[in-house]
Regions:
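Mature extracellular/periplasmic domains of secretome proteins
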Residues: 193-196, 217-220, 235-257, 266-287, ...
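C-terminal subdomain of the subtilisin-like protease fold in secreted/lumenal serine endopeptidases
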Residues: 249-251, 255-258, 269, 316-322, ...
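Extracellular S/T/G-rich loop segment that most often corresponds to the catalytic His/Ser-adjacent loop
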Residues: 28, 167, 283, 305-386, ...
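A cross-family glycoside hydrolase active-site/sugar-binding cleft signature
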Residues: 229, 257-261, 288-289, 324, ...
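Solvent-exposed loop/turn segments at secondary-structure junctions
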Residues: 30-31, 212, 231-235, 261-265, ...
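Subtilisin-like serine protease catalytic core
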Residues: 1-237, 311, 315-319, 341-345, ...
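Gly/Ser-rich catalytic serine loop of serine hydrolases
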Residues: 191-203, 290-292, 364-377
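Sec-exported extracytoplasmic/periplasmic mature domains
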Residues: 207-211, 246-250, 254, 276-283, ...
């Protein structure tokens, strides 16, 4: 509150100059910002590959052998991801070519533009027309267009150029001593960075102004958003995540929404300490469960509420909620096909499919992901805290879990990888609470608890 914008001074003496709106831990003091960065698996591979590439393991101790096996796991994952992304790129290129050819054939057939209904009524008399009908039916039913194709190609290209490139590192932009994980004061006040689309979409879900006739309504009314930038286009770094959490706590956050995640966390202890700091200071943390279609009881996903080893740790943060993504479709497609799940590590689900929210330049867009589900829960927590300020963060967490909407007889398709066989299961086995966030019922429970 005491900070003055753009005067080059740390008016409130919190260590961060001109942080009127928040702070950016992936920018430099000169105003430059990190946009793309590598994935964590790439960084680990780049660090260990020179050591183990031609290693003679004959005389390795048990400890050395364990480290080597960890490297081989990383190497296999790294190479799998590269091959997978190349295959995706080739598939998209093939689809793009088929779309272009199919549209040419059908435009010629109909003598101009054609509707979905006309396409379905078409009785193809030759293989070429039948091919075109099948392709364009698939395209229209899945809302695929040239813009989406271009976006996906661009994303995959950048994955290969930056994310999986072991020779790429933008860290010099930040100018910190990266090896010093205790370093706190670096970065700049540019919370928007090169691309604020993801953060703006997430923030809108939690707290966009309600009932003003513009765009959409956020879950909570009259909330203050504190943007803290720590996630690039790539994987976030543990040091930045830890500092972002500490910054939010020290500057008065009641809820920390974390719409990010990754599969490796080489400096997990640093993040653990920051999570414990938030926990001890009564700040509720809401984390997106991830978009890998995986069971996080069995597959690592960070950050996590478990301190120490992911599987062996026995102590957990009390003020943590992990959120999976539910959808709007009934029946077996009720869960987002991309969503992570786990009846021990995912606490609840929230809407995260086709969510309409804010993006920069006064625009709106539909996105999907557990990144969209988490702020639904964060917004719910903010609402409860605003209406019932006597409630503690622990009570708010308990209320949210106690009030979920359950579906005891719902059978769904368990989220799975594209190359895996679909299997049916009960929605109840996907999370701790067995349900989906329910704001109305949460207020009913809060009213009783508050009184």
């Amino acid at each position: 509150e005491d900070e003055v914008a753009d005067n080059g001074k740390d008016d409130d003496e919190n260590g961060y100059t001109d942080d009127v709106n928040g702070w950016n831990f992936i920018g430099g003091a000169d105003g430059k910002n990190v946009d793309n960065d590598t994935f964590e698996v790439t960084r680990i591979y780049a660090r260990l590959h020179p050591k183990y590439e031609n290693a003679d393991t004959t005389n390795f101790t048990a400890e050395e052998q364990a480290k080597y096996e960890r490297y081989k796991k990383v190497e296999n994952e790294y190479r799998y991801q590269i091959n997978n992304k190349l295959q995706q790129y080739n598939n998209i290129q093939s689809l793009e070519q088929s779309m272009q050819r199919g549209d040419e054939i059908l435009t010629d057939y109909f003598g101009g533009s054609y509707s979905y209904e006309e396409l379905q009524e078409l009785q193809a008399q030759d293989q070429e027309t039948a091919f075109a009908k099948n392709v364009m039916t698939y395209v229209q039913e899945n809302d695929i267009d040239s813009t989406l194709i271009a976006e996906q190609k661009k994303q995959l290209y950048e994955f290969m150029k930056y994310g999986y490139n072991p020779e790429f590192s933008p860290r010099d932009i930040v100018g910190d001593n990266y090896d010093d994980k205790s370093e706190r004061y670096y970065g700049n006040p540019d919370v928007a960075g090169p691309d604020a689309s993801h953060g703006t979409h997430v923030a809108g879900i939690a707290g966009a102004v309600r009932d003003n006739g513009l765009g959409m309504n956020g879950v909570a009314a009259n909330v203050l958003i504190m943007p803290v930038r720590a996630v690039p286009d790539g994987d976030e770094r543990d040091k930045d995540v830890a500092n972002a959490i500490r910054y939010a706590v020290d500057n008065g956050a009641h809820v920390i929404n974390m719409s990010f995640g990754k599969s490796y966390s080489p400096y997990k202890n640093v993040v653990d300490e920051a999570i414990q700091y938030a926990d001890e200071n009564g700040v509720l943390m809401v984390h997106a469960a991830g978009n890998s279609s995986e069971n996080t009881d069995e597959t690592e996903n960070y950050p996590t509420d478990t301190y120490g080893d992911y599987f062996e740790g026995t102590t957990t943060a009390n003020l943590w909620l992990s959120v999976g993504a539910s959808g709007w479709k009934p029946g077996d497609e009720f869960v987002g096909e991309f969503s992570n799940y786990g009846d021990q590590r995912v606490d609840l689900f929230a809407p995260g499919v086709d969510i309409y929210s804010t993006i920069p330049d006064n625009k709106y867009k539909r996105n999907q992901g557990t990144s969209m589900a988490a702020p639904v829960v964060s917004g719910t927590a903010a609402l409860l805290m605003a209406y019932y300020p006597d409630l503690t963060a622990a009570q708010v967490r308990s209320i949210i879990l106690e009030s979920v909407k359950t579906y005891p007889n719902l059978k769904i398709i368990i989220p799975h990888k594209a190359d895996a066989e679909p299997t049916e299961g009960s929605f109840e086995v996907l999370s701790v609470s067995d349900g989906v966030v329910n704001v109305y019922k949460a207020f009913q429970v809060a009213e009783k608890m508050s009184n």
